[in-house]
UniProtKB/Swiss-Prot annotation:
Gene3D superfamilies: Cyclin-like (1.10.472.10). The keyword Cell division applies. This is Cyclin-T1-3. The keyword Nucleotide-binding does not apply. GO terms for cellular component: nucleus. Abundantly expressed in flowers. Expressed in roots, seedlings, rosettes and stems. One of its GO terms (biological process) is regulation of transcription by RNA polymerase II. Belongs to the cyclin family. Cyclin T subfamily. GO terms for molecular function: cyclin-dependent protein serine/threonine kinase regulator activity. InterPro entries: Cyclin-like_dom, Cyclin-like_sf, Cyclin/Ssn8, Cyclin_N. The lineage of its organism: Eukaryota, Viridiplantae, Streptophyta, Embryophyta, Tracheophyta.
């Protein structure tokens, strides 16, 4: 029997999972360490120990980020708060396993907690109702059911249990630094033109959804993002060739981060590329085919305008 779609699980199944909050793992790692190597993330996460492979965990990460974006927009909270919740989830699942912690519960609790951390209060009742409606959007009666007293209080307790687990797992460390402030400072200091700034902001929004924020500090991500956006825009930034040194980023580190970013872009490009068309049906023909002239086609990027090969050109540094 195939795997059940996460959005179509029964209400009873979801609630039964969350009632077992006491079965959630206790933090086993050093909570003061919030940055990890790529090897730690890909090979030694708690989920990996429970048999969840990298592809599955990446899918779950994408799922809770998409869910958080939808939930945040439904509640009209800022993008900073939504991004803060995403990072909370990233950190949580470097301490706890997806196998034992439902991502919809953790994501909902993360957004509620992020609203508090970012001084953007949001009523718990609003979070509960909005989350339930998104989770069970396939069920026409969900919007009515969540307003019933018993269902509402049961789901509210689930979210509060998730919040308690998030707090204990993070050792109450809620001061999350995002790349937005250092990016704004860098763009202002370098007098970046509007198109470059827009590209950089869009990149940062994408990086928040990945493990990049678990590998590098915000000012490093911001600096590398400006360099990447400038390269794609063929724009010159800064008055000196190695302007990134002014932001405390070495050339070696910059190259390392940009390589990670290019890998993420390439993975995203392949994921969004449609499957190749089936080969044309061959029909028998006794006619002698005429000579065909060679056709030279220019390489194009129909799905992404990210010329990754530009980083292989000489003299880019």
């Amino acid at each position: 029997m195939g795997e059940e779609h996460p959005r179509k699980r029964s209400r009873q199944h979801f609630e039964a999972e969350a009632r077992n909050v006491s079965l959630f793992e206790s933090p086993q790692c050093e909570t003061s360490k919030w940055y990890f190597s790529r090897e730690e993330i890909e090979r030694f996460s708690p989920s990996r120990k429970d048999g969840i492979d990298l592809v599955k965990e990446s899918f779950l990460r994408s799922s809770y980020c998409t869910f958080l974006q939808r939930l945040g927009m439904k509640l009209h909270v800022s993008q900073v708060t939504i991004s803060c919740a995403m990072v909370m989830c990233h950190r949580f699942y470097m301490r706890q396993s997806h196998a034992k912690n439902d991502w919809q519960t953790i994501a909902t609790s993360s957004l509620f907690l992020a609203c508090k951390a970012e001084d953007e209060p949001c009523q718990l009742s609003s979070v509960v109702v909005a989350s339930y409606e998104i989770i069970y959007e396939w069920d026409p009666s969900a919007s009515i059911r969540i307003h019933q007293t018993e269902c509402y209080h049961e789901f509210k307790e689930i979210i509060l249990s998730g919040e308690s687990l998030l707090l204990s797992t993070s050792a109450f460390h809620l001061d999350i630094e995002l790349p937005y402030k250092p990016l704004a400072a860098a763009l202002n200091r370098l007098n970046a033109w509007p198109d470059l700034a827009t590209a950089a902001w869009n990149f940062v929004h994408d990086w928040i959804r990945t493990t990049l924020c678990l590998q590098y500090k915000p000012h490093v991500i911001a600096t590398a993002t400006v360099h990447l956006a400038a390269t794609f825009q063929n724009a010159k930034v800064g008055s000196r060739r190695d302007w990134w040194l002014e932001f405390g980023v070495t050339t070696k580190l910059l190259k390392e981060v940009i390589q990670e970013m290019c890998t993420l872009i390439e993975v995203d490009r392949r994921r969004n590329m449609p499957p190749p068309p089936p080969p044309p049906r061959r029909e028998l023909s006794w006619a002698i085919p005429a000579a065909v002239k060679p056709v030279h086609m220019a390489r194009a990027y129909p799905f992404h305008s990210y010329p990754l090969q530009s980083y292989r050109q000489a003299g880019i540094w």
